[in-house]
Amino acid sequence: MYQDKILVRQLGLQPYEPVSQAMHEFTDTRDENTPDEIWLVEHFPVFTQGQAGKAEHVLMPGDIPVIQSDRGGQVTYHGPGQQVMYVLLNLKRRKLGVRELVTLLEQTVVNTLAERGIDAHPRADAPGVYVGEKKICSLGLRIRRGCSFHGLALNVNMDLSPFLRINPCGYAGMEMAKISQWDNNATTDNIAPRLLANILALLNNPPHEYIPA
């Protein structure tokens, strides 16, 4: 069935705001026949403040812009070397609940890291994926008219120092991690295809097609 197909866009390195705007336009204009999409992207340095975000968690942004976002959660950082995956899914059509989608995204990351010998886990008290006590992946979603947007951000081989300018996801002193601390060969180029393969597997391997950005 055509509607089961997922279209995949690889967007490369992009500013946050135009991609966010395009994601909103896609979600606002889609109907029950619109195929789902997954967008793979890296962003230029930016702090994004989620709907629950409190200004006091942005400690000293300095030269990095702070942008308000309508995803769930608190403040986080995006930058080159972090793989972002936006999931634009019709949850009703795929018979997925919001909590199920969160669990599916967390498991996608856990499975991707396990392929590289990294033992990661979600936490009941703080969304995302962790290696030990350190956070390696942030999650933030929004649901509109039964469709998801926003998604996850997995730290691959990025500079983690900007996270010190914020309380990541509202947790003071939350330590961040990246895949390259365990695997020097990790890049967004080789992690993105595995993230995609693992989420598709958890969605029961629907047909998918890469489309030009």
UniProtKB/Swiss-Prot annotation:
It comes from Citrobacter koseri (strain ATCC BAA-895 / CDC 4225-83 / SGSC4696). It catalyses: octanoyl-[ACP] + L-lysyl-[protein] = N(6)-octanoyl-L-lysyl-[protein] + holo-[ACP] + H(+). Its EC number is 2.3.1.181. The record marks K135 as: Lowers pKa of active site Cys. The keyword Coiled coil does not apply. This is Octanoyltransferase. InterPro entries: aa-tRNA-synth_II/BPL/LPL, BPL_LPL_catalytic, Octanoyltransferase, Octanoyltransferase_CS. GO terms for cellular component: cytoplasm. The active site is at C169. Keywords: Acyltransferase, Cytoplasm, Transferase. Pathway: Protein modification; protein lipoylation via endogenous pathway; protein N(6)-(lipoyl)lysine from octanoyl-[acyl-carrier-protein]: step 1/2.
